[in-house]
Amino acid sequence: MAKEIIFSDEARNKLYEGVKKLNDAVKVTMGPRGRNVLIQKSFGAPSITKDGVSVAKEVELKDSLENMGASLVREVASKTADQAGDGTTTATVLAHAIFKEGLRNITAGANPIEVKRGMDKACEAIVAELKKLSREVKDKKEIAQVATISANSDEKIGNLIADAMEKVGKDGVITVEEAKSINDELNVVEGMQFDRGYLSPYFITNAEKMTVELSSPYILLFDKKIANLKDLLPVLEQIQKTGKPLLIIAEDIEGEALATLVVNKLRGVLNISAVKAPGFGDRRKAMLEDIAILTGGEVISEELGRTLESATIQDLGQASSVIIDKDNTTVVNGAGEKANIDARVNQIKAQIAETTSDYDREKLQERLAKLSGGVAVIKVGAATETEMKEKKDRVDDALSATKAAVEEGIVIGGGAALIKAKAKIKLDLQGDEAIGAAIVERALRAPLRQIAENAGFDAGVVVNSVENAKDENTGFDAAKGEYVNMLESGIIDPVKVERVALLNAVSVASMLLTTEATISEIKEDKPAMPDMSGMGGMGGMGGMM
């Protein structure tokens, strides 16, 4: 297919048109008074959202060059959401402002490479200043404030996330699911839970709840299938003498071995239960090792030269209780040593930092949560499916932003932190580098300007008032239309969100500004289908047999 090559200002101007169209669609969602965007779906009802990244992902432009510009900024919004959980609209608005201002200067004759160098230096200085301005999240109230702002000022969601984080800790896993009612709920599973249920309903001890409940059990961990009971007999005899329950976690328990365990359970000889080990392959081995460390036991593994016959009571783990239903097993208060658990947690954290696979990262985070304090499930309720999707998006955003706040701290929100950071930096640059730095500094006003515009206020007056305020915590509360102490009013942002949004915006804008040529496919208009209306006279063929 033939390609079209466009150079210099003409190429950059076309790219800018695409960025502008994307920005115009996304920026209306910004701030507490941001508007909704209605998105047509290929099937079903349209979706309504106030989430910047959801809007950005839907923007697909007809002109291929404009679409190239839009798709680069769309990628920035998406990347910002992945890294920080929020700040997608901020990143888009900043990228547009930097590109617009930079384009004007480059068209007037500035050197794009020098301009880029100045932009990078300014960005570095502002990020350093943001880190200085940040402060730790001190309590549940501040967690709720961050979550509320990221959930588009929904206090109920903010409080729900704060409750969840308080119960499972900052390393705990918090998942978001759709509720079956219109009410929001929070369910917390304490201890380690994995998705394997009892191997036989005959193990059930609580017929009303259909669960197996074992009090202070021993836990045997084996990484292969158990088919022959003879291998198990030595350890079963030792358990019988103690009078305590036993939970067996193995790859599988088959045939005669399972049948004999069930018979012993029914006769009251042993209080016993068995479940399959969670996961598959290498992940199964890792999770068995996690359970061993949590319960103070050892995995009996033939790879390490151990056989099931050689297992003793000293190899078994212990816990204060184990609850098993048909789908899940929960181990509460494992008897493992805290130092060993902490070492395992740090090992998994290091693996999370190194992995490049999103799937592996998700599974490692699940293992981390299971070891460090449980899982919280936020169930989101709504009256309609459209409302449910929109609300679930907001809860996901708020959750990620809250984790970012706990990780790196908070700064004042509402676009004010970028303006305060700008006022503190002093760069000694010359020529086009100085122009590049000035472009970034001017663009830092764009988020606050947009928040004020969306709320119906004079953006110039608002920006000027915040810039000239004597108290460095003063900002603009767009919901009330007042200048307030942002920290006292609970209008705060995670510093990670501001930092990532700025870095990504400068990165994409400088890429676009240093673009000197674009190559795109020439769309060929397909010929229209021939008009069939002139064939109406074929009725005369009716005499054919």
From Swiss-Prot:
Name this polypeptide is given: Chaperonin GroEL
EC number: 5.6.1.7
Gene Ontology process terms (BP): protein refolding
Similarity-based family: Belongs to the chaperonin (HSP60) family.
Pfam family, one: Cpn60_TCP1
Enzyme class: isomerase
Subunit structure: Forms a cylinder of 14 subunits composed of two heptameric rings stacked back-to-back. Interacts with the co-chaperonin GroES.
Gene Ontology cellular-component terms listed: cytoplasm
UniProt keyword annotation of Nucleotide-binding present: yes
CDD domains: GroEL (cd03344)
Function: Together with its co-chaperonin GroES, plays an essential role in assisting protein folding. The GroEL-GroES system forms a nano-cage that allows encapsulation of the non-native substrate proteins and provides a physical environment optimized to promote and accelerate protein folding.
